[in-house]
Amino acid sequence: MSPKVQALIFIVGLITLLAAHAQEELSDNIESERGCSGAYKRCSSSQRCCEGRPCVCSAINSNCKCRKTYTELFKEYFEK
């Protein structure tokens, strides 16, 4: 491949990577404005968990906290 084509592919890849990162940051900002709870934070019927995380409560329906999904735990394990 010519150097111009390689440079073009590199630039397109870089732009795609930056756009994906910006989208993640934007979604985090939207969720924080919406008032959702992050991982291991308190939750209730009025205070939902962010990113579709489950709200897990104790047996007497108190001390509810947002738990990470299996996908998040799996991803963190392999990023170490």
From Swiss-Prot:
SUPFAM superfamilies: omega toxin-like. CDD domains: Spider_toxin. It holds the Pfam family Toxin_9. Residues 23-34 form a propeptide. One of its GO terms (molecular function) is toxin activity. Keywords: Disulfide bond, Knottin, Secreted, Signal, Toxin. Disulfide bonds join C36-C50, C43-C55, C49-C66, C57-C64. Belongs to the neurotoxin 02 (plectoxin) family. 05 (U19-lycotoxin) subfamily. The presence of a 'disulfide through disulfide knot' structurally defines this protein as a knottin. This is U19-lycotoxin-Ls1a.
